[in-house]
A protein has these predicted regions:
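Alpha-helical segment proximal to the catalytic Tyr-Lys
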Residues: 124, 169-170, 233
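Substrate-binding pocket helix/loop in short-chain dehydrogenase/reductase
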Residues: 95-96, 103-108, 205
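Short C-terminal tail/terminal secondary-structure segment
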Residues: 2-3, 225, 236-249
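Short, small/polar-rich loop/turn modules that mediate ligand/substrate recognition or access, typified
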Residues: 172, 177, 235-237
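Residue(s) in the substrate-gating loop at a strand-loop-helix junction
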Residues: 139
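Conserved glycine-rich cofactor-binding loop
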Residues: 18-19
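Active-site helix of classical SDR
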Residues: 119, 156, 164
Length: 249
C-alpha cells in the first residue's frame, strides 16, 4: 500500500529514547519500517524501549551526550544515518533570583550544546546521507510561550531553535534538512512525576489550552515522522508547533 510517510529501510538515530516522546517516536518509526538506533543514559530503560519496537535488528547505545567526548563516542559506533531525532532534554524550574552557573551549565549542555556538537560530529564523520533529515525536539517554551520559573529551560530551547535555522541553511547543500517540533505540555512521566504541580495546578493549566487537554506522545511522534519522511523532502528550516492551540493565547 502506498504510504508517503513510510520510513522503510531508513536508519534513524533517536536520542533521549529512554522514555516519553523519544521512546514513543522510536516505537512509531519502527512501525513504519525504520531501522532504529536509540541512545540514552539508562541501559535498563533503553532495553525496555527496544522490547516495544516492531521488527528486528534495532540497536541501543548507552551514552551521555552532555560532553563533546560523549557525543564523539556515540558517533564512532554509528552507521551512516538517514535521520536523526535530537530529542534528549532536561528541565529545571527556578525563579530568576535562584539561577546558578551549575544549573545553567547542566541545562544548556543537554538541551542546546549537545545537539550542536552531535550534529557537527555526524557531519565531520560523514555519518548523514544525502539526502537525510534532522529533527530537533524543542518546546513552545523556546518559541512562543513563557511561564514563571521556566526561564532556563525556555532559553535553552530558544537557543536550539535559533541554531536549527542556521544549520538548515548551511547544510541544505549537503541534502540535509533540519527542522524543529515545538510541543506544549505532553502526558509523559515528566508531568506525572512533577511534584511542583498539584492536580489543581494541572487542571488550571489545561484550561489554558483551547483543546482543553495536554498532548499525547504519539501526537508529537507523528509530526516527527512527517519531517523524517520523504513527504517532507521540500521542508527545511521550519518550526512545527504542536500544542493544542496553547500558543494562540
Amino acid at each position: 500500500m502506498y504510504n508517503p510517510f513510510s520510513l522503510e529501510g531508513k536508519t534513524i538515530l533517536i536520542t533521549g529514547a529512554s522514555s516519553g516522546i523519544g521512546r514513543t517516536t522510536a516505537i512509531e518509526c519502527s512501525k513504519l519500517g525504520a531501522n532504529i538506533i536509540i541512545t540514552g543514559r539508562r541501559e535498563d530503560a533503553l532495553v525496555e524501549t527496544i522490547s516495544f519496537l516492531t521488527g528486528e535488528g534495532h540497536e541501543y547505545v548507552v551514552g551521555d551526550l552532555s560532553s563533546e567526548g560523549g557525543c564523539a563516542s556515540l558517533v564512532e559506533k554509528l552507521p551512516v544515518l538517514d535521520g536523526l531525532v535530537s530529542n534528549a532534554g532536561v528541565g529545571k524550574m527556578l525563579p530568576v533570583q535562584f539561577y546558578s552557573e551549575d544549573v545553567l551549565d547542566e541545562v544548556f549542555k543537554v538541551n542546546a550544546f549537545a545537539p550542536m556538537l552531535l550534529l557537527k560530529l555526524l557531519i565531520r564523520k560523514k555519518k548523514l546521507k544525502n539526502p537525510s533529515s534532522v529533527v530537533f525536539t524543542s518546546s513552545i517554551s523556546g518559541y512562543s510561550n513563557v511561564a514563571p520559573a521556566n526561564g532556563i529551560y525556555g532559553a535553552s530551547k530558544s537557543a536550539l531553535t535559533a541554531y536549527m535555522k542556521y544549520a538548515a541553511l548551511e547544510l541544505a547543500g549537503k541534502g540535509i534538512r533540519c527542522n524543529a517540533v515545538h510541543p506544549g505540555r505532553v502526558n509523559t512521566a515528566l508531568i506525572a512525576n512533577n511534584r511542583l504541580l498539584s492536580e489543581a495546578d494541572i487542571t488550571k493549566d489545561m484550561e489554558q489550552y483551547p483543546l482543553k487537554r495536554y498532548g499525547e506522545p504519539e501526537e508529537i511522534a507523528y509530526a516527527i515522522i512527517y519531517l523524517l519522511s520523504d513527504a517532507a523532502s521540500w521542508v527545511t528550516g521550519s518550526n512545527i508547533v504542536i500544542d493544542g492551540g496553547r500558543s494562540l493565547k
